[in-house]
Structure formats: structure tokens, C-alpha cells
Amino acid sequence: MIKKSIYLFGALILPLLVVWIFRMQYGYIYHAVDDVTINYSIINGESMLLPYIGIVLTKTLVIIQNIFPMINIYFIFLVGTYSISFSVFIFLLRKRKCKILLIVILLIIEFTLLKYFTYSVVAYLLATSGVLLLYKEEKTILSSIIIFVGFSLRVQVIVSVILLLLGIVLYELIVNKKKEKTVYLAIVTTLVIVTNFIFVKTNSEVENYITWNNKSTLIRDYPEINYNEYKDKLANENISKNDLESYNAWIFAEKNVFSNNMLDRLDEIRDNSKKYDLSIKNNIIQIFSNELLKVFIYFIVLIPLLYRPKKIFGHLSLVMPIALIVLLSIRQRMVERVYIPLIVIFIFSFIIYLQDIFEKRNYRLLRGTENIIFSILSLIMLNNAIQYGTDNLYWFVHQSFPHNKVYNELLKNNEKNLYIFAGYGNIINSQPNVSKVFVEKDKLTKNMLTLGNWQTFTPQYKEKLDDLNVSDSNNLLSSALDSDNIKFVLPEKSGLMEKVKTLFKEHYNKDVNFIFQEKVDEEVNVYVLRSDVSE
């Protein structure tokens, strides 16, 4: 009993300790703009983060944030769920003979994966740990909660996780007859999807935003449209070079220009051959030119050499991660924060289900040393992957938070004005660090925006503009023209200025200029947008 208690305590504490060590060693832990954006939203009580985070989860986080306003609930939640997922993996290894070695490997992977600490990665880990806990243990309620939170944290991971674990799910359903647990998995998954669907369909403002955002995402997630290649087609659709360049530069907070219809026409400019790379040669080159994927494929090939897959279940477990990676390549979406968590959750599920869906081949020459050989070769591959990431992907580099006090004071001293920045990075720098438990909330402001991000046109976006007396929340640029309380914080030679000027000339036949108001620092000034004013 004591040993079991100690093991459980260690399983809970060790992953948290790893996060703490990484935080102390390498500093700032948020590596994606999205997590900072979400963190601001939760602190500010904004509970609509669809289509990415489920409505039940965000509302719950906002309620808890309101109860405990002095602490950063989202940061605690993200670190906690990241650690809990590894705690579950460690717990599931408690009966394995070589559990110490496996736990060390898990903790090394956890430490390394913190380089990609984002809500998407946490969602993959948490949902996977919940599914494995559901089938391996008699903890239906706990595992169902973990699955629900994991799938709610990033709704888009549902399909990938289910496909990756398909061999395991079918094994448990067909061989172990765990129909009831499979039904629980189906119910929880459906609950996440249905609650979001009902919320969207019963809120017209949210539905309008989701519709627009889906159209916008269709364009942004594919390779950028080259103007010269589609010049004639774009001209036929009355889409100018400046329209395309503005959109690609995330300048689209003007629905009179970037309407649903315009986005549909822009998306239809390319045929599917430009969106999806179906060339076998190109995909092979794409995958094998990636050192991490190359190591992973070697690992996949090594498994059936030493372990015989049991029927279709083992084969599916090996095929699905490769299939998902190939689909990413075809989709031209081969980004580290997507394929690395897929690799990691495959490794974890393989470790936990090795004895269930694989069996040793028992080569006479190896004389029962298959496990030792496999462990040594796997450690060599892991070392090579970490070495490559360290040398080429900056995995272990200290990052500090570049807080800009001048920007922050500008916003704090002029709270009735709306300040538009050229990039979201400048907005992040203008705010206090939210990558910690206690945030300096007195330094947080709401009166800043960019001309386009994934929250543009959300209900909270429109509410923010209404609070700042912006005349038309669907057309921020038009509202900014000749306004005294909408200002731009830009470098003196910002490319944004020319794009906005051209947009007004092409779509409204108006000549506009950015008029200097005050200096912020050596490189950045505050401007207002005025009509019919010569330079």
C-alpha cells in the first residue's frame, strides 16, 4: 500500500517538477500567439473561443477565473493538464517490469515537448491519456472527464486522436469485449461536438463569425496564393493585388472588402491540385527531408522487425501515424506543432499497449534479447532526434518576455482610445507577462487590436469596439477614417500604410493618409487616418 501511494505521489509530482525545471532553465513558456490570446480572453471574462476551444470548457474557465480573480486560471489549467497527461501515462506503467527506464524516457520527452507547449499539444496529450486510462483501468468517470476536457481544449484534434488510436479501440472492442467503455468514448466525443454545435446554431452572431472564419481559414491554411500566377483570374473576380497582399498580411478587418462572397471567390481561384500535393515523389521528398520524421519512420520500421503485430490491431497502430503524416504532407500542412504531438502520442500508446497488440518474434539468434535491442536502438533514435532539435530547431534556448513599458503606458494613459498595432507580437509586448500564476492585472489593457487575427469579428471583438464607441465593428478601417479615438501605432515606413491607402482608393475611391500625432520611441509613432490630406 505504501509503495502504491509513493508511486502515485511520484506520478503526480514528477511531471510538475519537469515543467518547473524547464521554466526555471529556459524562461518564458508560451511559444505560440494563440495561447496568449486565449489567456487574455479568459482573464477578461470572454467565454466564446470557438471554433477552437469548446464552449463548456471556456465558460467553466471563465467562471473559475471570476471566482479567483487574483490568479491566472488558464495558465494553471494548461500546466496542470499537461502534467496530468504525463501523470496518467506514468500511472499506466506501474505494473511494467522496466517501468523506471520507461518513466525516465517519458520525462525526457515531456521536457523536450515543452518547446511546443501550446493548447493544441496539451489537447492531444490529455485526450490520448484519457482514452488509454478509460480502457486500461476501471476509472470510467475520471477518464471520461479527461477525454472531455482534452477534446474540448482543441476540438480539431478529435479526428486525429481517434484515428491514431483506432487499432487500440478496435482491439478493446473486439478482443476484450469492452463495448460499454467504447460507448462512453463515443458519448463523450459526441457531447463535445453537439454542445458546440447547439451553441453556434442558437446564437446568430456566433454563427456568422464561425461562417466567416471557416471561409477565411480555408484560404490561410493552404499555401499562399501567388498573385502573378493567378493575375487574370483575380482580375476577373475584381480582386486586386493589394487585396490579396493585404489579406496575406492579416489586414482584413473590413467586411465591405473581405466579405463572405469575396473569400469564396478567392478560395475558388485555385483548384484542388494547388491545395493538395498528390505527387508521390514530392510527398516522399517532403517527409524524408525532415530529420525528425525520418527518425520516426525508422522507429516504425524497427517495431515489426522485432515484434509481430497481432492481427489487424497491431498493423493499424503502425499504419495510422504514417497515414496521418502523409495526409499532412498532401495537405501541405507539415508543421512541427502538429506532427510532433502525433509522434509523441503514438510512442506513448505503443509503450502502454506493446504487450497487448504485439508479440516478440523470438529470433533464435537473438535468444530473448529483443527488448534490450529495441530499447537501445530506440534510445539512440531519441538521442539523435533531441540532438537534431537542439542544433537546428532551437529546442533548448532561454526565452525572456520582452515587455514594452512605453507601449503599456500609452495604452493605460489613453484608455478611451483604440490603438491598432501592425502585428500581434507588439500587442503581446504591450501587456504584462501572462505566462505565470500571478499576472499584473493592473497593467492589462483592452484598448488594442490588429487589423486581423482569428478573433476578428467574434462577439467579444464587436463588444470591445462598441465599448470604445467605434461606429461600425464590421469595418474597422472605415470607422478609423477621420476618427479622433482610433489611432495606429506603426513604424515610420510600415508597409501597412500603403496597403490601407490603396484599399481606400480601390474600394471607396478616397485618398487617405496617415498623419503623425506623437512619437512612441525611436522607430514607432502614433498616427491617425485622415481623408483628403496631402503629405
Task: Give names to the regions the model predicted.
Residues V19-Y40, E46-L61, F68-N72, V397-Q399:
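Extracytoplasmic catalytic/substrate-binding loops of multi-pass membrane glycan-assembly enzymes
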Residues S85-F91, S279-K311:
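Hydrophobic, aromatic-rich transmembrane alpha-helices
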Residues L102-L107, P309-L328:
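Transmembrane alpha-helix segments characteristic
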Residues I108-E110, T140-V157, V161-L166, A186-I198:
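Membrane-interface alpha helices of multi-pass inner-membrane proteins
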Residues A123-Y124, V159, L324-I325, R331-Q355:
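Hydrophobic/aromatic-rich transmembrane helices and adjacent perimembrane loops
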Residues I198-N236, L379-L451:
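Membrane-embedded, lumen/periplasm-facing catalytic core of multi-pass transferases
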Residues F396-N404, K412-K416, G423-S483, E498-E518:
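Extracytoplasmic
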